[in-house]
Design a protein with these regions (language model features):
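A short, compositionally biased domain-edge/stem linker segment
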Residues: 1-4
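Bacterial carbohydrate/catabolite-sensing allosteric modules
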Residues: 6-53, 62-77, 82-156
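Short, flexible loop motifs at catalytic/binding sites
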Residues: 59
Length: 156
């Protein structure tokens, strides 16, 4: 809760990577609008490079998440699929848990957090069914994504 000289309001933080990309920007816009309608002010903590490769550059970018003033944050939304590093995501969660801040995982799952996940398997099934029944295609090829990625495996 931010308490200033003239104002008092709830604050939500959103942690992600790649807000400069249309898809991530759209998700942040929808989430921010929903939080604002509930009376929150929204702070966005964004890095430009995902943390998949553990490089000095990505470590430097990950330091943006250390700037979160947990004294004024009332809820933290984390988008782990954009961050692409369990270590970075776990570090953010550990700091938020220590400050007793509720965490919403958007498109991810973690113990002790409120998890919002997408049904990637069912959505692909619906698209394939549509292509077969409506467009009469019978000889289909598709790529599910990166081998070993849980969402890619779910599509298969």
């Amino acid at each position: 809760m931010y308490i200033g000289k003239f104002h008092k309001y709830a604050v939500a933080g959103i942690c992600l990577v790649g807000m400069q990309n249309d898809h991530a920007a759209h998700i942040v816009k929808v989430a921010s609008d929903a939080l604002i309608k509930k009376g929150f002010k929204v702070m966005i903590f964004n890095a430009f490079t995902d943390m998949f490769y553990d490089t000095p550059y990505s470590k430097g970018e990950a330091s943006v998440y250390h700037l979160i003033n947990l004294d004024i944050i009332d809820v933290l939304v984390i988008m782990p699929e954009t961050i692409k590093s369990e270590w970075v995501t776990d570090t953010i969660i550990r700091y938020a848990n220590a400050a007793k801040i509720p965490i919403i995982m958007l498109d991810g799952s973690h113990n002790g957090c409120t998890n919002i996940t997408y049904d990637y398997g069912r959505s692909l099934e619906t698209v394939v069914e549509h292509v077969i029944t409506e467009h009469k295609c019978t000889d289909l090829f598709f790529m599910a994504g990166t081998k070993g990625n849980c969402f890619s495996e779910e599509r298969i």
